[in-house]
Regions:
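Generic structural "secondary-structure junction" signal
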Residues: 45, 53-55, 70, 87-89, ...
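Short Gly/Ser/Thr- and Asp/Glu-enriched loop/turn motifs at secondary-structure junctions
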Residues: 46-48, 80, 89, 130-134
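Catalytic beta-strand/loop module used to bind and position nucleotide/cofactor moieties
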Residues: 93-159
């Protein structure tokens, strides 16, 4: 993993002795964003436990700062939306980027991607899988996958 870039808390009055350090998102999947290819992807597994905050989350409202600092969990902030997630070893992460002159509506794009995932997981024997909300996949009431995306410089990044 590349060296972490430190971000600062949104609360200038926060106590840094109990405040975990918030780093810019730099997990291995993000390296594909800079790839010269029109389309690129990453499939892998986290090498550690990470808490990843969505673009609009703030550290104070999203996590138990004292416990996160005590446990030494690395906290990252991704450039895409959505809520905070925990990543850990033995989880599958997949991401892709696509350059495009015409960026689709994100909701339509999530629906398209989720329908393709459901179709292909179904072929593998995974049943009762459906879209929940804008970007999640569930089996029954159990969420099994969440995703987010952002666009920058005519490039879509989905993870």
């Amino acid at each position: 993993m590349k060296p972490l870039t430190m971000l600062f808390t949104n609360n200038p009055l926060s106590d840094m002795s109990t405040q975990p350090v918030l780093y810019a998102y730099n997990l291995p999947d993000y390296t594909i964003f800079e790839s010269p290819k029109e389309f690129d992807y990453y499939i892998g597994e986290p090498d550690n436990i990470y808490i990843v905050l969505g673009r609009s989350n703030n550290i104070e409202g999203a996590i138990n700062c004292e416990n996160v600092k005590k446990d030494g969990i690395i906290t990252l902030k991704r450039p895409s939306g959505g809520e905070s997630v925990i990543l850990s070893p033995n989880m599958l992460i997949f991401s892709f980027k696509q350059k495009s002159d015409k960026i689709q509506n994100p909701v339509k794009l999530f629906k398209l991607i989720n329908s393709k995932l459901i179709e292909n997981f179904s072929k593998l024997g995974i049943e009762n899988l459906y879209s929940k909300g804008i970007s999640d996949l569930s089996i029954g009431e159990k969420k099994i996958m969440g995703s987010s995306m952002f666009t920058k410089n005519k490039t879509i990044f989905y993870h």
